[in-house]
From Swiss-Prot:
Record-annotated membrane-spanning stretches: 5-25
Subunit organization: PSII is composed of 1 copy each of membrane proteins PsbA, PsbB, PsbC, PsbD, PsbE, PsbF, PsbH, PsbI, PsbJ, PsbK, PsbL, PsbM, PsbT, PsbX, PsbY, PsbZ, Psb30/Ycf12, peripheral proteins of the oxygen-evolving complex and a large number of cofactors. It forms dimeric complexes.
Family per record: Belongs to the Psb30/Ycf12 family.
Organism: Huperzia lucidula
Protein name, UniProt field: Photosystem II reaction center protein Psb30
Length: 33
């Protein structure tokens, strides 16, 4: 596999994983407040 393909896959994975995490963190912060 090319490094470009691996980089694109890692970026996609980070976006897919960080999406729900950011929502959960914001919800937790609002809930704590």
């Amino acid at each position: 596999m090319n490094l470009e393909v691996i980089a694109q896959l890692t970026v996609l994975a980070l976006i897919v994983i960080s999406g729900p995490l950011v929502i959960a963190l914001s919800a937790a912060r609002k809930g704590n407040l």
